Amino acid sequence: MSTSKRKRADEAQWNKRSTKKKGSAPQAKKPGGKGERPSLQIQTLLHSGDTMITVPSGGVCDLINTYARGSDEGNRHTSETLTYKVGVDYHFVADAASCKYSNRGTGVMWLVYDTTPGGNAPTTQDIFAYPSALKAWPTTWKVSRELCHRFVVKRRWLFTMETDGRIGSDTPPSNQSWPPCKRNVDFHKFTSGLGVRTQWKNVTDGGVGAIQRGALYLVIAPGNGITFTAHGQTRLYFKSVGNQ
């Protein structure tokens, strides 16, 4: 092949490459499409100082999806909400009464869904209907058969606390050392996929009396009589759905 023919062939290949159609610009996403999901709203419940949680023998049950009506991020904007995720970050401290004894106990934390709260928050006895002989051992508690259509345990977590007969301010003699025990416990959990749907009455507050259907409770019970206080926060991730 002559040099002129080779040159013409090379020029033809170059022209083909240079005339390729350029990629079209990415199309703008349509409003409300799959690419545009509204961000989850966040409500934070702080428990410290005067608002710390006191956990007595038999436990405590607190409403946590307390979304009052309003325009802020932590408020509900419609008559229906969906709670997707919950994060709990707490520091448990055995109280002075428990620290007088050497003891070890397994406590329990639950997230409990209440289909029809009826205007009043239940007690742990209402939910689990445990006999008085099992009050100090929450690991044995189960939702009663008669109320299983109303109360649904969404999550259940265990934790261990210990006491050694000394309070935190005690100091050992100079020639001794005391082994540590779990009188102070850090408790951190994050859970998703809850799908708790709450229907609200036509009121503005976020109490249990404002809920028509779908309350979510944080239930904590001490094990073997080691009562304590809880300091920290609960964070809920939710959406306002349905009609205004």
From Swiss-Prot:
Cell location: Virion; Host nucleus
Record-linked Gene3D superfamilies: 2.60.120.20
InterPro entries, sorted: Gemcoat_MSV, GV_A/BR1_coat, Viral_coat
Chain residue ranges for the region called Disordered: 1-39
Record-level GO BP terms: symbiont entry into host cell; viral penetration into host nucleus
Primary localization: virion
GO terms, molecular function: DNA binding; structural molecule activity
Motif stretch (Bipartite nuclear localization signal): 1-24
Gene Ontology cellular component terms for the protein in this record: host cell; host cell nucleus; T=1 icosahedral viral capsid
Keyword terms, alphabetized: Capsid protein, DNA-binding, Host nucleus, T=1 icosahedral capsid protein, Viral penetration into host nucleus, Virion, Virus entry into host cell
Job of this protein: Encapsidates the viral genome into characteristic twinned ('geminate') particles. Binds the genomic viral ssDNA and shuttles it into and out of the cell nucleus. Plays a role in protection of the genome from degradation, virus acquisition and transmission by insect vectors, infectivity, and systemic movement. The CP of monopartite geminiviruses is absolutely essential for virus movement.
Subunit structure: Homomultimer. Interacts with the movement protein. Binds to single-stranded and double-stranded viral DNA.
Protein family membership: Belongs to the geminiviridae capsid protein family.
Descriptive protein name: Capsid protein
UniProt organism field: Maize streak virus genotype D (isolate Raw)
